[in-house]
Design a protein with these regions (language model features):
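Conserved hydrolase catalytic core segment
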Residues: 119-158
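Catalytic active-site module of serine/aspartate enzymes centered on a nucleophile-bearing elbow/loop
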Residues: 274-315
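Alpha/beta-hydrolase-fold enzymes
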Residues: 143-222
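Short beta-strand/loop motif that positions the catalytic acidic residue
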Residues: 252, 258-260
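Conserved acidic catalytic loop of the alpha/beta-hydrolase fold
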Residues: 102-121
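Catalytic-loop region of hydrolases
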Residues: 1-41
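Conserved alpha/beta-hydrolase "acid-adjacent" motif
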Residues: 265-271
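N-terminal cap/lid subdomain of alpha/beta-hydrolase-fold enzymes
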Residues: 30-87
Length: 315
């Protein structure tokens, strides 16, 4: 069985959409489950502050990916790349505006080629990882037998672009920029109902602040301690530049399963339903699923029982 150690490869002479040449570009990844080329392969793309460690004791999606889980490591080889520049492997990109979501998708496709992977049994991506996956299939329409984008879409809408713009303003702050950006982002990842139901305007008497205030401070501090602002700026740039073309979507040859969240503010449910309608009306083999939750975008990480049930019917 394949280890989950961090592995590295190099992409030679990679030119970004903006025309910037990188002669020797690093890409890191992890394997989980069966030895490569001995079982069907599933690629999982991580979310904005995630990484390649998708399974195992500290795996960010260990409720779905594991031995005996819905994505069963006894049956599959799971691969997960780090978005280049996310810092998990120590690599950062200073000139983050050189890159778009399409560039990262192209790097992932080249990374698969480097590993000798010509076909995936499934391509799964949550949030921005799913958006990068859309761009991957526009580059390589026959890459995956099954495509499962979760809480995501193939484009940066005006709403999402506006959120990214606010993030940029906050990241330019001189005082605690990453902490501020994370606090704002958390309000986009959850919903008013979720926070109101959880905190009920209760005070933390010891700190003399609302418990909701303390919760936001906690999330800001935690990310500030474990994530680098260079990585966050890059990820926000990628989120702002998702731009798969509808004509390219129609070339995708996968069985497509769109999974939305009914209360999502980040990638709203109606946008995912519109994408489903477009693909269905154009004869694509597409299915629509929806997680019911008050928790908004983060429900794709929180409502694991619902997601397990949906994925169980696909795998």
């Amino acid at each position: 069985m394949e280890s989950s150690l961090l592995n590295h490869l190099k992409i030679d002479n990679f030119t970004t959409q903006n025309g910037v040449l990188y002669t020797d570009f690093p890409l890191s990844y992890q394997f989980f489950g069966q030895k490569l080329h001995t079982a069907p392969i599933i690629l999982v793309n991580h979310a904005l502050t995630g990484n390649s460690n998708v399974a195992g004791e500290k795996g960010w999606w260990k409720t779905l990916v594991g031995y005996g889980s819905v994505i069963d490591l006894q049956k599959y080889t799971v691969v997960c790349f780090n978005v280049a520049g996310n810092g998990y492997d120590g690599f950062f990109i200073d000139n983050y505006k050189n890159f778009t979501a399409k560039d990262m998708a192209r790097l992932f496709v080249l990374g698969l080629e480097n590993l000798g992977i010509k076909e995936l049994y499934a391509l799964v991506g949550g949030s921005i990882g799913g958006s990068i996956a859309w761009e991957m299939l526009c580059e390589a329409p026959h890459l995956a037998k099954k495509f499962i984008p979760v809480a995501t879409d193939y484009k940066t809408t005006d709403w999402l672009h506006s959120q990214c713009l606010v993030q940029e303003f906050l990241l330019e702050s001189k005082d605690r920029p990453l902490e501020k950006a994370r606090i704002h982002a958390m309000l986009n990842y959850r919903t008013p109902e979720s926070l109101n139901q959880r905190f009920k305007r209760e005070q933390d008497e010891q700190k003399n602040i609302l418990k909701s205030h303390d919760w936001l401070n906690y999330h800001g501090t935690v990310l500030d301690n474990r994530f680098d602002i260079k990585a966050y700026r890059l990820m926000n740039q990628l989120l702002k530049t998702i731009d798969a073309k509808e004509e390219d979507l129609l070339k995708i040859n996968s069985e497509i399963h769109l999974i939305g969240v009914d209360s999502d503010l980040h990638y709203p449910a109606f946008e995912i339903k519109n994408s489903y309608d477009f693909l269905k009306n154009n004869g694509k083999n597409v299915y629509h699923h929806e997680i019911k939750s008050i928790h908004g975008h983060d429900a794709f990480l929180m409502e694991y029982e619902q997601l397990n049930e949906i994925l169980g019917k696909i795998f």
